[in-house]
Design a protein with these regions (language model features):
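Substrate-binding/catalytic cleft of secreted carbohydrate-active enzymes
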Residues: 89-92, 98-279
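Secreted/periplasmic carbohydrate-active enzymes, especially glycoside hydrolases
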Residues: 1-122, 150-160, 165-166, 183-185, ...
Length: 279
Protein backbone atom coordinates (compact mmCIF):
# COMPACT_ATOMS: atom_id res chain seq x y z
CA UNK A 1 0.00 0.00 0.00
CA UNK A 2 1.30 3.44 -0.95
CA UNK A 3 0.02 6.58 0.79
CA UNK A 4 0.33 10.03 -0.76
CA UNK A 5 -0.61 13.49 0.45
CA UNK A 6 -0.83 16.53 -1.79
CA UNK A 7 -2.42 19.98 -1.93
CA UNK A 8 -4.83 21.31 -4.55
CA UNK A 9 -4.70 25.10 -4.59
CA UNK A 10 -8.04 26.86 -5.07
CA UNK A 11 -10.01 23.66 -5.77
CA UNK A 12 -13.29 23.69 -7.63
CA UNK A 13 -15.74 21.80 -5.45
CA UNK A 14 -17.90 19.04 -6.90
CA UNK A 15 -21.67 19.52 -6.56
CA UNK A 16 -24.78 18.73 -8.64
CA UNK A 17 -24.62 22.29 -10.02
CA UNK A 18 -20.86 22.26 -10.65
CA UNK A 19 -19.67 18.66 -11.13
CA UNK A 20 -15.98 19.56 -11.35
CA UNK A 21 -13.65 16.59 -11.76
CA UNK A 22 -9.89 16.07 -11.47
CA UNK A 23 -7.58 13.33 -12.72
CA UNK A 24 -4.71 11.86 -10.71
CA UNK A 25 -1.95 10.01 -12.58
CA UNK A 26 -0.15 7.65 -10.20
CA UNK A 27 3.12 6.01 -11.24
CA UNK A 28 5.24 3.72 -9.07
CA UNK A 29 8.95 3.36 -9.83
CA UNK A 30 11.48 0.83 -8.67
CA UNK A 31 14.65 2.69 -9.45
CA UNK A 32 14.18 3.90 -13.02
CA UNK A 33 11.73 1.12 -13.85
CA UNK A 34 7.96 1.76 -13.83
CA UNK A 35 6.30 -1.07 -11.92
CA UNK A 36 2.73 0.21 -12.03
CA UNK A 37 0.64 3.17 -13.13
CA UNK A 38 -2.99 4.09 -12.63
CA UNK A 39 -5.33 6.94 -13.57
CA UNK A 40 -7.96 7.95 -11.01
CA UNK A 41 -10.71 10.45 -11.70
CA UNK A 42 -12.00 12.16 -8.56
CA UNK A 43 -13.78 15.21 -7.23
CA UNK A 44 -13.25 17.45 -4.23
CA UNK A 45 -16.18 18.06 -1.91
CA UNK A 46 -17.13 17.79 1.74
CA UNK A 47 -20.20 16.14 3.20
CA UNK A 48 -21.61 15.50 6.63
CA UNK A 49 -24.85 14.78 8.44
CA UNK A 50 -25.32 17.10 11.43
CA UNK A 51 -27.57 15.87 14.21
CA UNK A 52 -30.80 17.81 14.27
CA UNK A 53 -29.97 19.68 11.05
CA UNK A 54 -29.51 17.18 8.23
CA UNK A 55 -27.20 16.64 5.27
CA UNK A 56 -24.56 19.22 4.32
CA UNK A 57 -22.65 19.33 1.04
CA UNK A 58 -19.63 21.63 0.86
CA UNK A 59 -20.73 23.25 4.11
CA UNK A 60 -24.27 24.09 2.93
CA UNK A 61 -27.49 22.32 4.01
CA UNK A 62 -29.10 20.30 1.26
CA UNK A 63 -32.22 18.22 0.72
CA UNK A 64 -32.12 15.24 -1.63
CA UNK A 65 -34.41 15.53 -4.65
CA UNK A 66 -33.91 11.93 -5.56
CA UNK A 67 -35.33 8.84 -7.19
CA UNK A 68 -35.00 5.12 -6.53
CA UNK A 69 -33.64 4.07 -9.90
CA UNK A 70 -33.69 0.37 -10.81
CA UNK A 71 -30.85 -0.89 -12.95
CA UNK A 72 -32.87 -1.90 -16.00
CA UNK A 73 -33.52 0.43 -18.90
CA UNK A 74 -37.14 -0.46 -19.61
CA UNK A 75 -37.54 -2.20 -22.98
CA UNK A 76 -33.77 -2.06 -23.56
CA UNK A 77 -33.15 -4.49 -20.70
CA UNK A 78 -30.58 -4.67 -17.93
CA UNK A 79 -27.39 -4.87 -20.02
CA UNK A 80 -25.38 -1.67 -19.68
CA UNK A 81 -25.98 0.90 -22.41
CA UNK A 82 -24.03 4.07 -21.68
CA UNK A 83 -25.95 6.22 -24.16
CA UNK A 84 -29.29 5.11 -22.74
CA UNK A 85 -28.10 5.70 -19.18
CA UNK A 86 -26.95 9.21 -20.12
CA UNK A 87 -30.29 9.93 -21.79
CA UNK A 88 -32.15 8.70 -18.70
CA UNK A 89 -30.05 10.85 -16.38
CA UNK A 90 -30.46 13.92 -18.58
CA UNK A 91 -34.25 13.52 -18.41
CA UNK A 92 -34.06 13.20 -14.63
CA UNK A 93 -31.86 16.30 -14.49
CA UNK A 94 -34.40 18.23 -16.56
CA UNK A 95 -37.15 17.42 -14.07
CA UNK A 96 -35.06 18.70 -11.15
CA UNK A 97 -33.63 15.44 -9.82
CA UNK A 98 -30.22 15.63 -8.15
CA UNK A 99 -29.88 12.26 -6.40
CA UNK A 100 -30.01 8.55 -7.30
CA UNK A 101 -30.55 5.53 -5.09
CA UNK A 102 -29.32 2.39 -6.88
CA UNK A 103 -32.36 0.25 -6.20
CA UNK A 104 -31.58 -2.33 -5.03
CA UNK A 105 -28.25 -3.57 -6.26
CA UNK A 106 -24.67 -2.54 -6.76
CA UNK A 107 -24.51 -0.24 -9.80
CA UNK A 108 -22.62 -0.53 -13.05
CA UNK A 109 -19.43 1.60 -13.08
CA UNK A 110 -20.80 3.39 -16.14
CA UNK A 111 -23.73 4.73 -14.11
CA UNK A 112 -21.50 6.03 -11.33
CA UNK A 113 -19.14 7.66 -13.83
CA UNK A 114 -22.07 9.43 -15.49
CA UNK A 115 -23.36 10.63 -12.13
CA UNK A 116 -19.90 12.06 -11.46
CA UNK A 117 -20.00 13.90 -14.78
CA UNK A 118 -23.61 15.09 -14.79
CA UNK A 119 -23.88 15.94 -11.09
CA UNK A 120 -26.02 13.42 -9.20
CA UNK A 121 -25.52 12.53 -5.55
CA UNK A 122 -25.68 8.76 -5.13
CA UNK A 123 -26.80 6.37 -2.43
CA UNK A 124 -25.08 3.19 -3.61
CA UNK A 125 -27.02 0.16 -2.40
CA UNK A 126 -25.69 -3.35 -1.94
CA UNK A 127 -28.44 -5.87 -1.26
CA UNK A 128 -32.16 -6.56 -1.54
CA UNK A 129 -31.85 -9.61 0.72
CA UNK A 130 -29.52 -10.79 3.48
CA UNK A 131 -29.56 -14.12 5.31
CA UNK A 132 -33.36 -14.48 5.42
CA UNK A 133 -35.10 -15.22 2.14
CA UNK A 134 -37.44 -13.03 0.15
CA UNK A 135 -37.57 -15.67 -2.58
CA UNK A 136 -36.36 -19.26 -2.81
CA UNK A 137 -33.61 -18.50 -5.30
CA UNK A 138 -32.37 -15.31 -3.63
CA UNK A 139 -29.08 -13.97 -2.30
CA UNK A 140 -29.68 -15.53 1.14
CA UNK A 141 -28.18 -18.72 -0.30
CA UNK A 142 -24.84 -16.93 -0.75
CA UNK A 143 -24.93 -14.35 2.04
CA UNK A 144 -22.68 -16.07 4.58
CA UNK A 145 -19.96 -16.77 2.03
CA UNK A 146 -20.17 -13.68 -0.16
CA UNK A 147 -21.63 -10.72 1.76
CA UNK A 148 -18.33 -9.35 3.06
CA UNK A 149 -16.50 -9.97 -0.21
CA UNK A 150 -19.23 -8.23 -2.21
CA UNK A 151 -19.40 -5.27 0.19
CA UNK A 152 -15.63 -4.80 0.13
CA UNK A 153 -15.56 -4.91 -3.67
CA UNK A 154 -18.40 -2.39 -3.92
CA UNK A 155 -16.89 0.12 -1.52
CA UNK A 156 -13.38 -0.13 -2.91
CA UNK A 157 -14.67 0.22 -6.44
CA UNK A 158 -16.62 3.44 -5.82
CA UNK A 159 -15.00 5.18 -2.85
CA UNK A 160 -13.12 7.64 -5.10
CA UNK A 161 -16.27 8.73 -6.93
CA UNK A 162 -17.47 12.14 -5.69
CA UNK A 163 -21.08 11.42 -6.64
CA UNK A 164 -21.28 8.70 -3.99
CA UNK A 165 -22.33 10.39 -0.76
CA UNK A 166 -23.76 7.44 1.18
CA UNK A 167 -23.71 3.64 1.30
CA UNK A 168 -26.88 1.59 1.70
CA UNK A 169 -26.47 -1.95 3.03
CA UNK A 170 -29.95 -3.16 2.11
CA UNK A 171 -33.55 -2.66 1.10
CA UNK A 172 -36.56 -3.95 3.04
CA UNK A 173 -34.62 -7.00 4.20
CA UNK A 174 -36.68 -9.52 6.23
CA UNK A 175 -33.74 -9.69 8.65
CA UNK A 176 -34.78 -6.31 10.07
CA UNK A 177 -37.45 -8.04 12.19
CA UNK A 178 -35.19 -10.88 13.36
CA UNK A 179 -34.03 -10.65 16.96
CA UNK A 180 -30.42 -10.80 15.79
CA UNK A 181 -30.97 -8.53 12.79
CA UNK A 182 -29.21 -5.56 14.34
CA UNK A 183 -26.03 -7.65 14.58
CA UNK A 184 -26.10 -8.34 10.84
CA UNK A 185 -26.68 -4.63 10.19
CA UNK A 186 -23.74 -3.71 12.41
CA UNK A 187 -21.56 -6.29 10.64
CA UNK A 188 -22.27 -4.81 7.21
CA UNK A 189 -22.03 -1.20 8.39
CA UNK A 190 -18.68 -1.92 10.04
CA UNK A 191 -17.34 -3.19 6.71
CA UNK A 192 -18.28 0.13 5.10
CA UNK A 193 -16.64 2.09 7.92
CA UNK A 194 -13.48 -0.03 7.71
CA UNK A 195 -13.13 0.33 3.94
CA UNK A 196 -14.30 3.95 3.76
CA UNK A 197 -14.39 6.02 6.96
CA UNK A 198 -15.53 9.14 5.05
CA UNK A 199 -19.12 8.15 4.27
CA UNK A 200 -22.16 7.33 6.38
CA UNK A 201 -24.30 4.22 6.02
CA UNK A 202 -28.05 3.70 5.79
CA UNK A 203 -30.57 0.96 5.02
CA UNK A 204 -34.07 1.15 3.50
CA UNK A 205 -36.32 -0.02 6.36
CA UNK A 206 -40.00 -0.81 5.82
CA UNK A 207 -40.95 -2.42 9.15
CA UNK A 208 -40.92 0.46 11.66
CA UNK A 209 -42.92 -1.59 14.16
CA UNK A 210 -39.82 -3.81 14.41
CA UNK A 211 -36.85 -1.54 13.85
CA UNK A 212 -37.87 1.22 16.26
CA UNK A 213 -37.91 -1.22 19.17
CA UNK A 214 -35.46 -4.06 18.43
CA UNK A 215 -32.26 -2.01 18.14
CA UNK A 216 -31.96 -2.30 14.36
CA UNK A 217 -32.65 1.33 13.42
CA UNK A 218 -30.55 2.53 16.33
CA UNK A 219 -27.48 0.88 14.81
CA UNK A 220 -27.55 2.83 11.54
CA UNK A 221 -25.59 6.03 10.90
CA UNK A 222 -28.58 7.41 8.99
CA UNK A 223 -32.11 6.13 9.60
CA UNK A 224 -33.63 5.30 6.21
CA UNK A 225 -37.38 4.66 6.21
CA UNK A 226 -39.32 3.40 3.20
CA UNK A 227 -42.84 4.88 3.13
CA UNK A 228 -44.58 5.30 6.55
CA UNK A 229 -44.04 9.05 6.35
CA UNK A 230 -46.56 9.44 9.17
CA UNK A 231 -44.01 7.79 11.49
CA UNK A 232 -41.07 10.08 10.68
CA UNK A 233 -41.74 12.31 13.67
CA UNK A 234 -42.01 9.36 16.04
CA UNK A 235 -38.84 7.79 14.67
CA UNK A 236 -36.97 11.08 14.90
CA UNK A 237 -38.00 11.54 18.52
CA UNK A 238 -37.41 7.89 19.48
CA UNK A 239 -33.98 7.29 17.98
CA UNK A 240 -30.70 8.94 19.05
CA UNK A 241 -29.28 9.83 15.61
CA UNK A 242 -31.20 13.07 15.14
CA UNK A 243 -31.82 12.36 11.46
CA UNK A 244 -34.39 10.69 9.20
CA UNK A 245 -33.92 9.86 5.52
CA UNK A 246 -36.91 9.26 3.26
CA UNK A 247 -35.19 6.39 1.45
CA UNK A 248 -38.30 5.48 -0.57
CA UNK A 249 -41.46 7.54 -0.36
CA UNK A 250 -43.59 6.93 -3.46
CA UNK A 251 -44.15 4.26 -6.08
CA UNK A 252 -45.06 4.85 -9.72
CA UNK A 253 -47.24 1.78 -10.01
CA UNK A 254 -49.93 2.62 -12.57
CA UNK A 255 -51.04 1.77 -16.10
CA UNK A 256 -50.09 4.49 -18.56
CA UNK A 257 -53.14 6.34 -19.83
CA UNK A 258 -55.62 4.51 -17.58
CA UNK A 259 -57.80 6.76 -15.39
CA UNK A 260 -60.71 5.11 -13.56
CA UNK A 261 -63.69 7.39 -12.91
CA UNK A 262 -65.19 7.95 -10.43
CA UNK A 263 -62.00 8.08 -8.41
CA UNK A 264 -62.00 5.88 -5.33
CA UNK A 265 -59.53 5.33 -2.52
CA UNK A 266 -58.08 1.94 -3.36
CA UNK A 267 -54.80 0.29 -2.37
CA UNK A 268 -52.54 0.48 -5.44
CA UNK A 269 -55.76 1.15 -7.41
CA UNK A 270 -55.95 -2.38 -8.87
CA UNK A 271 -59.06 -3.37 -10.82
CA UNK A 272 -60.61 -6.54 -12.25
CA UNK A 273 -59.30 -5.74 -15.73
CA UNK A 274 -55.76 -5.95 -14.29
CA UNK A 275 -55.15 -2.24 -14.81
CA UNK A 276 -53.90 0.22 -12.19
CA UNK A 277 -55.47 3.66 -12.29
CA UNK A 278 -53.18 6.65 -12.63
CA UNK A 279 -55.44 8.64 -10.31
Amino acid sequence: TVFMRFTVRRPEFWSPETPSLYTAHTTIYEGNHITDSYITRFGIRSMEVIKGKGFYLNGAPRKFKGVCNHHDLGPLGAAVNRSALKHQLEMLKDMGCDAIRTSHNMPAPELVELCDELGFMMMVEAFDEWDIAKCANGYHRHFDEWAEKDMVNMVRNFRNNPSVVMWSIGNEVPTQCDEHGYKVAAFLQDICHREDPTRLVTCGLDQPQCVLTNGFAEVMDVVGINYYTELYKKAYETLPQGNILGSETASTVSSRGVYKIPVELKYRAMYEDHQSSSY
